[in-house]
A protein has these predicted regions:
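N-terminal, polar/charged subdomain of small-to-medium soluble alpha/beta proteins
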Residues: 1-76
Length: 76
């Protein structure tokens, strides 16, 4: 899995992403997303939404660790 594949997965899932940055390599990534999809959601619910995208990859070992910074536009 590389940065472009992660980006494509996120963009295809969320309706409105105003900022997306991905850093890392191999199987460890840090992801920052600013999206209207996160309005009125708490931190845990935001993380659940994004982590669902990566469940299979984490279970298979293709991804090992993901650090998330998830915000609504009004929080930036």
């Amino acid at each position: 899995m590389d940065n472009n594949q992660i980006q494509e997965l996120i963009i295809s899932f969320l309706d409105d992403v105003s900022e997306l940055s991905i850093s890392g390599k191999d199987c460890n990534f840090s992801i920052k997303i600013v999206s209207k999809d996160f309005i009125n959601l708490g931190t845990i619910d935001r993380h659940k939404i994004i982590m669902r995208l990566f469940t299979d990859l984490l279970q298979s070992g293709e991804l090992h660790a993901i650090s998330l910074d998830l915000k609504a536009p009004s929080e930036v």
